[in-house]
Amino acid sequence: MAIILRSSDPLLSRIHPEPQEIDHFDNLPDSILLLIFNNIGDVKALGRCSVVSKRFHSLIPQVENVFVRVDCVISDDDSSSLLSDKPRSASAASPFSAIFRLVFKPLQALGQFLKRSGSSSLPSGSSPSSLLISGGDDGEIEQGGVTHHSPTQVLKNFDEIKFLKIELPSGELGIDDGVLLKWRAEFGSTLENCVILGASSVIPPTNSDKTEASSAPVAAVEDNGSIPESFYTNGGLKLRVVWTISSLIAASARHYLLQPIIAEHKTLDSLVLTDVDGQGVLCMNRDQLEELRVKPLSASSASKRTLVPALNMRLWYAPSLELPDGTVLKGATLVAIRPSESKKEVCDVSWVSSAFDEPYGVAAKMLVKRRTYCLEMNSF
């Protein structure tokens, strides 16, 4: 028996087509989406966003602010065993600690990190390492079910990067527990300046120290800022020289091996290469980046790093330095470095005292008020 719905039937008035779903992202202009993507910055998160829709995929390459976090370090030997599916020993499975024990291993790691696929191989006998990011497309190495690829492979998908920050999983310099060592360097086609802050030990403030520090100003330095004789005889000066040379080697290696990225991404206004530990920071602004593209750098014949020019150095030292928050730096040392040919004002120390974030910024400001010692270093 057929059922006929008449126009007077109340059921008929309630039958209507289902409205189409509204995608509110379609109502947002591209400029707003790009603002969101630029605030995200992280290259992994942006990669996930790019697979959401064709529109997102077309906008991601226009992102100007990119942050690349390096997840792991895998030596070439380990990479070969991974690709061939051969069993690996426990020590080979954990190259991270061994690679970052000495200065030169991570320098090789940076070299492999910044090499593009298909580029010429390194000389035989060398055993460089790769800095890799997990996840994403076009991976090169699979480890433990996770696909890895180099940051340069990721960056080639971006066309308009202006602000790029790369973070290594650890500082290059192996230092003892409790030792403070931080450096910040600026480069053009060569080293423009470098500031190094070190201390043989750091004593954190106690609760009583914090209370006293909040209620009283920092006491004035009682000595005249002179370096004690024991500094020269107990190995203190030698240790500071090692810190200085090691920091300069690490900085010059980072600079040398950033060349491919700098050459390819001509829209860059700022490039920062740092590490999770906050040990070292290499910075380049737009003028410095352009200088490197125009003026070829001088490479060291001994290793893959930029040649460090002849240097003038100023050193400040305090056997014990108490900061406003109660922290005490034992054997506090500040070294300000510029090329010997630098024409900038010698007495200007503003770039030195502003090199580090707090609480170490105030340490630099306190140290530059002490007696200055001048040193020179040949090119290396």
Swiss-Prot record:
InterPro entries: AUF1-like, F-box-like_dom_sf, F-box_dom
Residue ranges of coiled coil: none
Occurrences of domain F-box (ranges): 22-70
SUPFAM superfamilies linked: F-box domain
Stated name of the protein: F-box protein At4g18380
UniProt organism field: Arabidopsis thaliana
Upper classification of the organism: Eukaryota, Viridiplantae, Streptophyta, Embryophyta, Tracheophyta
